[in-house]
Swiss-Prot record:
CDD domains: Ribosomal_L20. Belongs to the bacterial ribosomal protein bL20 family. The gene is rplT. The lineage of its organism: Bacteria, Pseudomonadati, Pseudomonadota, Alphaproteobacteria, Hyphomicrobiales. It comes from the Bacteria. This is Large ribosomal subunit protein bL20. GO terms for molecular function: rRNA binding; structural constituent of ribosome. InterPro entries: Ribosomal_bL20, RIBOSOMAL_L20_CS, Ribosomal_protein_bL20_C. Coiled coil: none annotated.
Length: 134
């Protein structure tokens, strides 16, 4: 069996690692051993932070919705409850965007949520409200 030299593949792997470490500080961008550890760690952080990013954006959307809804005298939780009871299904990202860019449309949703909360306080069940609204 012929002998296999690994110089070409090793150089390619090293080049790939050093290319990924571009912009790192100090030895981490020059030395294979340090660069490999830094790149591995950076990939772990990137994986973790892709999950954290989703949580952070959801929290931001909720804060924006809460701020916009409080101007109308509701809290975020009551507003979401009212939307659910009114049968309106809009996600938080869209609600946040509407609160910033289309306040009139967002105000209509707030009024629908208030109406649903008031109606259900008087009547009783969600099904009656959905038939009354339609």
């Amino acid at each position: 069996m012929a002998r296999v030299k690994r110089g070409v593949t090793s150089r390619a792997k090293h080049t790939k690692t050093l290319k990924a470490a571009k912009g790192f500080y100090g030895r981490r961008k020059n030395t294979i051993r340090a660069a490999k550890a830094a790149v591995d760690r950076s990939k772990q952080y990137a994986y973790r932070d892709r999950k954290v990013n989703k949580r952070n954006f959801r929290a931001l959307w909720i804060q924006r919705i809460n701020a916009a809804v409080r101007e109308s005298g509701l809290t975020y939780g009551r507003f979401i409850d009212g939307l659910n009871k009114a049968g309106i299904e809009v996600d938080r990202k869209v609600l946040s965007d509407m609160a910033i860019h289309e306040p009139a449309a967002f105000g209509a949703l707030v009024e629908a949520a208030k109406k649903a909360l008031e109606y259900l306080k008087d009547a009783g069940t969600t099904n009656e409200f959905e038939t009354a609204v339609k």
